[in-house]
Swiss-Prot record:
Record's keyword annotation contains Transcription: no
Name of the molecule in the record: Molybdenum cofactor sulfurase
Gene name per UniProt: hxB
Species whose genome carries this gene: Aspergillus fumigatus (strain ATCC MYA-4609 / CBS 101355 / FGSC A1100 / Af293)
Keyword Membrane: no
UniProt record similarity statement: Belongs to the class-V pyridoxal-phosphate-dependent aminotransferase family. MOCOS subfamily.
Domain of life: Eukaryota
Protein function: Sulfurates the molybdenum cofactor. Sulfation of molybdenum is essential for xanthine dehydrogenase (XDH) and aldehyde oxidase (ADO) enzymes in which molybdenum cofactor is liganded by 1 oxygen and 1 sulfur atom in active form.
HAMAP family in alphabetical order: MOCOS
Enzyme class (EC, first level): transferase
Pathway: Cofactor biosynthesis; molybdopterin biosynthesis
Length: 843
């Protein structure tokens, strides 16, 4: 018999035990994965098509009533709930004589249920200890522990604490919680701690309980509770992490630990045998089972019935959790090894991988199929997690970034102390923001997590993304700045090709007609981003990244009639809708609808809390809500109340700083100390009063797009219009004599501008960092992968993708009386633009 190599043995694990080939299962059961690479199974895995079909048949073939009744339909629901509860226990090999299962919303709800039980079980309160790798929901229990607690920062600390339990006899109730698997990096913690704690705790009165967060583990690994003496007292999990659907969680309780809930104060419908409300305030709790006492109110019985279909579908497709464990272990090892092997041209590692030294991707007992990492460039500088996630999204690759609701694991891996993080919080760092690197360190990580239906193509697709966009093949800066021809500048050389304002934030542009001078204010072009659309539920401003159809909302300013005219739909379509709103703030006599009343409302715009005036007229809300399919209404920035300012920018020589890394020392003179930063007021713009781009730069970018003919997934090499950059000013060059002498990206060296016959002065604040919104076609609302893909390769400064320049009126202009300079404070298509260059820049 021919021997089998270790490599061959590994690949045999790929899909072993599945009903069919992985790709065949994906094509039939997971149509939502078409043209998509999904690598966020730790967040939730995906539901199978046949699961939804099976559940649909259940609902349409049976009548399920509220379980709290004696009707036939209600009893059917009760019977099915009981059956599914037993099936769930057996899935985890939990003996129903030893364990009970309580249905809850999710793992967090189960944790809170245990915490409430511990709090109410004794007047003296309880002590709480948790492992540093705990999910945020486990950390939160500490706020209920009146006896204090401890965060164990290592396994050794836990082992030492366990060994000392028998030395200290205490009546205090104690709870120790930890994750079976870190949701950050997939490291698996010792299951044996539960038995060790129980054995040690029995010598002190058995008052130490264990809580195991199994939510991350059970998504790809079996959980074996067959030995009740070694099992946790409380195990929490979420079924959607295993099956994708239904959205349901569970608390598995060792019955011997059930007395913790005896004194739980709250009771809900269905958990009591009798309640007195008049006179004597008394109630009798149900005693038949633990779940009867804890499942408050009507159970989500439809979801529980769906869980039955989920169990059956999962077993039919994948056979067992052990099969899934082997499959994902093989893929995770391959992905880890490939990322770990990536190097830049100079040998610098591309990936900083955050794997515990205690774990091994070859050992399922120590490591799950999760990989946490960050990227570095060839100089060792960090690449922002947000940029990587945005680029991945343009390629239809779904990943996760941030602190991952794992504050201890993330901060420990990144080297942040509590004092450090408090300081960064004061500096503006918040969960979910794009402060990717602060004080030279990443603030979060990138996470890839695998699931039952992950295949080899998913692994290859992500690694190829990193290789194409982040692995530097050679030391060159040719792609950073386009070549500039060494010819004397013949002034005037630049002029305004087009002027655009965006009256409604994130909607289409209004292009200023040729020959018309347009007012400029400190906040930018008159009427620019003075309105926005806000969600009627949350108050958050809508944007094209979430709602690409906003590009098809076309506002225009009619100064003759003093109205904002809005049309919806593709240009030239016959079914366009029309709305008109008065430009006059107090005028309610509108052409097609009434302004009615406005109400002040707090809204979130680019992370800022902004007070806007929302239009309460139902026709206004209906106009936008019907078109976008989201409940929203129009809102306006209040007059004379700008509390928003342009973001602080790097000095105009930022490109020069970047280039210094590649040229001889002394090539550039030392920069003078920067002047104090000025504040530039804005309305609802993202970052600055005015955004400027160059036609020459757009042309050069399109040349690069066309040159890169390799089409990745659904992307194309089609040229992009300047409109995708949503600039206020497009500057072009006068090239009548020398059409081939364009100077793309020359604007990177501009530090100031004079525009128009009155030479109105502008300051250049810095480069515009770009996001995936530039991939939305402004004429169709269709999302593509360009130009972001090409920009990611050719336009990076300090690891940020940039295109265009932020500008504002010069401070010397705003000190003058605007009324005395009304004509000067205007711009027009065709106005001459005279740039001033950084002091050390020469052609």
């Amino acid at each position: 018999m021919v021997g089998v190599t270790s490599c061959e043995e590994e690949i045999l694990e790929y899909g072993r035990g599945y009903s069919e080939d992985v790709d065949t299962i994906r094509e039939r059961e997971y149509p939502q994965l078409k043209d998509t690479t999904y690598l966020d199974h730790a967040g939730t895995t995906l539901y199978a098509k046949s699961l939804i079909e099976s559940f649909s048949r259940e609902l349409t073939s049976n009548l399920f009533g509220n379980p709290h009744s004696l009707s036939t339909s209600s009893q059917l629901s009760t019977q099915r709930v009981d059956d599914v509860r037993l099936r769930a226990l057996r899935f985890f090999k939990a003996d129903p004589e030893e364990f009970d299962l309580v249905f809850v919303a999710n793992a967090t709800a189960a944790i809170k249920l245990v915490a409430d039980g511990m709090r109410d079980s004794t007047r003296q309160g309880f002590w709480y200890g948790y492992h540093v790798d705990a999910h945020t929901s486990l950390v939160g229990v500490r706020e209920l522990a009146e006896k204090g607690g401890r965060c164990f920062t290592s396994d050794d600390e836990v082992e030492d604490w366990i060994s000392r339990l028998c030395d200290v006899r205490s009546e205090s109730l104690k709870l120790f919680a930890y994750p079976a698997q870190s949701n950050m990096n997939g490291r698996r913690l010792p299951f044996s701690w539960c038995k060790k704690i129980r054995d040690q705790g029995e010598t002190t009165g058995g008052n130490v309980y264990t809580l195991l967060d199994a939510a991350s583990l059970v998504s790809t690994s079996p959980l074996d509770l067959s030995d009740a003496s070694a099992a946790p007292d409380f195990t929490v999990l979420s079924f959607y992490k295993i099956f994708g659907f239904p959205d349901l969680g569970a608390l598995i309780v060792r019955k011997s630990a059930g007395q913790i809930f005896e004194h739980r104060r709250y009771f809900g419908g269905g958990t009591v045998d009798m309640v007195l409300t008049r006179g004597l305030q008394w109630h009798a709790k149900k005693q038949s089972s633990i779940h009867d006492r804890l499942e408050d109110g009507t159970l989500p019985f439809h979801n529980i019935i769906a869980l039955d279909s989920a169990f059956a579908t999962h077993e039919r497709l994948f056979g067992s959790m052990q099969n899934i464990s082997s499959h994902t272990r093989f893929l995770a090892k391959r992905l880890y090894d490939r990322l770990n092997a990536l190097r830049h041209f100079n040998g610098q590692r591309v990936c900083e991988l955050y794997k515990s030294p205690r774990s091994d991707y070859n050992q399922p007992s120590t490591q799950g199929p999760i990989i946490a990492f960050n990227l570095r460039n060839s100089q060792g500088s960090w690449i922002g997690k947000s940029e990587v996630e945005r680029l991945a999204a343009t390629k239809n690759i779904q990943i996760r970034s941030g602190s991952l609701c794992n504050p201890g694991g993330t901060s420990g891996s990144l080297g942040w102390t509590g004092a450090d993080l408090l300081q960064q919080f004061s500096a503006g760092l918040r969960c979910g923001d794009d402060h990717d690197v602060m004080d030279g360190r990443p603030t979060g990580v990138l996470r890839l997590s695998l699931g039952p239906m992950t295949n080899l193509e998913d692994i290859n697709t992500f690694v190829e993304l990193v290789e194409e966009f982040y692995v530097e093949k050679a030391a060159t800066v040719d792609s950073l700045v386009a070549p500039v021809h060494s010819v004397p500048l013949q002034q005037p050389r630049f002029y305004i090709e087009s002027l655009s304002l965006y009256p409604i934030k994130s909607c289409g542009p209004f292009k200023v007609p040729d020959g018309r001078r347009w007012e400029i204010r400190r906040e930018g072009l008159a009427w620019d981003r003075e309105w926005c659309l806000i969600h009627q539920g949350t108050g958050a401003a809508l944007n094209q990244k979430k709602y690409p159809r906003m590009a098809l909302i076309r506002p225009s300013i009619d100064l003759d009639r003093n109205v904002l005219r809005v049309t919806c739909g593709e240009p030239g379509s016959t079914d366009q809708k029309l709305l008109e709103v008065s430009l006059l703030r107090e005028n309610t006599e509108l052409a097609t609808t009434s302004l009615c009343q406005r109400t002040s409302k707090a809204s979130t715009v680019c992370g800022d809390q902004v007070t806007v005036q929302a239009y309460t007229s139902p026709p206004v809300a209906q106009f936008f809500s019907d078109f976008l399919g989201v409940p929203c209404t129009l809102a306006r920035f209040p007059p004379h109340s700008s509390t928003r300012y342009a973001s602080p920018r790097k000095a105009p020589g930022a490109w020069k700083q970047y280039l210094r890394k590649f040229v001889m020392p002394g090539s550039f003179p030392q920069d003078p100390s920067p002047p104090p930063a000025e504040k530039h007021p804005i309305l609802l713009s993202n970052e600055s009063p005015i955004l400027l781009i160059s036609r020459s730069s757009v042309n050069y970018l399109n040349e690069n797009i066309k040159a890169n003919q390799k089409k990745i997934r659904t992307g194309t090499s089609k040229a992009v219009a300047a409109d995708v950059f949503r600039a206020n000013i497009v500057v072009a060059e006068s090239l009548a004599d020398s059409p081939k002498m364009e100077q793309p990206y020359i604007e990177d060296q501009w530090e100031a501008l004079k525009i128009g016959p009155g030479e109105l002065r502008f300051d250049v604040l810095g480069s515009c960092q770009r996001c995936s919104m530039v991939c939305i076609d402004q004429f169709t609302g269709v999302r593509r992968d360009e130009p972001f893909s090409t920009l990611a390769k050719t336009r990076k400064i300090n690891n940020k993708i940039v295109f265009g320049r932020h500008c504002s009126l010069s401070a010397s202009e705003v000190t003058q009386d605007q009324h005395d300079n009304a004509e000067r404070w205007t711009l027009m298509v065709g106005d001459i633009v005279i740039p001033s260059y950084a002091h050390d820049y020469t052609l």
